[in-house]
Amino acid sequence: MTHVDQINVDQINIDGFEFGVQSSPGPKGAVVTTVFVIVHGIGTSHRYSKPLYGAIAANCSTYTVDLPGFGGTRTPKHRLRVEDYAKLLGDLLDTLGVTSCVVIGHSMGAQLATELAVQRPQLVSHVVLIGPVADAHRRTAVAQAVDLYRDTLKEPFSANLLVFGDYARCGLRWYTKTLRAMLAYAIDERIRCVVAPVLILRGRNDPIARRGWCSILAHNSPQGRLLEIAGHRHLVHYSAAVLVADRILEFAGVPRGAAE
């Protein structure tokens, strides 16, 4: 992972829901004020985004969050919809003093990023959806499980270790409740309401966020475009972190090494 001089770690409560937050102010002497926010997928945590976080934080102010019920945060008493998570995330960013950001969501996190951009268009300048779910033609628990299994077989062992460790920490009950929320969210319809530029990024060999599905999202987005990374899968932000960071920074108009 790219070295980051300073990482701040906080636990923040928003309306009784606990978030974990890691943040870096970016490099000393940075002349770019763009803020990036990374949102993880179902069952996981900030841990599998560390390589991407490091690559972006070496250039800009960056936050990565653990959503309520994930990454060791307190499990909510009731299921949260994607819309609820997005509302809480927006309130969290208000608390952190973030007034404009590039929001990056992976997998289910892409749903939250989309919904945040719909709910708070003035807060979100750019949207990056990495391996977005759930394919409208495969929006069942069984289909998602099959695709996840196929993906896992060829992901890096270190990535699988992180992901399944987080699954265990999350627990089956909360995972299942959140899965229902994930499958109920029609990202292909909600993305039509996003006014910010949208970058849809997938590993070319991703069996979860397939090319046809991602092409639909890019088409439905008023300012959407699709980018594929050859040789990578659903965890492309982990296995090709530096390349993915480069593409995201380029999309947001931020030069690498933007420091004096």
Residue ranges and their predicted role:
Residues 187, 196, 210-219:
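Short alpha-helix in the alpha/beta-hydrolase fold that links the catalytic acid
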Residues 111-119, 123-155:
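Flexible "cap/lid" loop of the alpha/beta hydrolase fold
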Residues 204-209, 234:
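Acidic catalytic loop of the alpha/beta-hydrolase fold
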Residues 47, 63-104, 246:
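Active-site loop/oxyanion-hole signature of alpha/beta-hydrolase fold enzymes
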Residues 232-245:
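Catalytic histidine-centered segment of alpha/beta-hydrolase-like enzymes
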Residues 194, 200-202:
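Short beta-strand/loop motif that positions the catalytic acidic residue
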Residues 160-189:
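Hydrophobic, aromatic-rich cap/lid helix
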Residues 23-72:
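Conserved HGGG/HGGXW glycine-rich cap/lid loop of the alpha/beta-hydrolase fold
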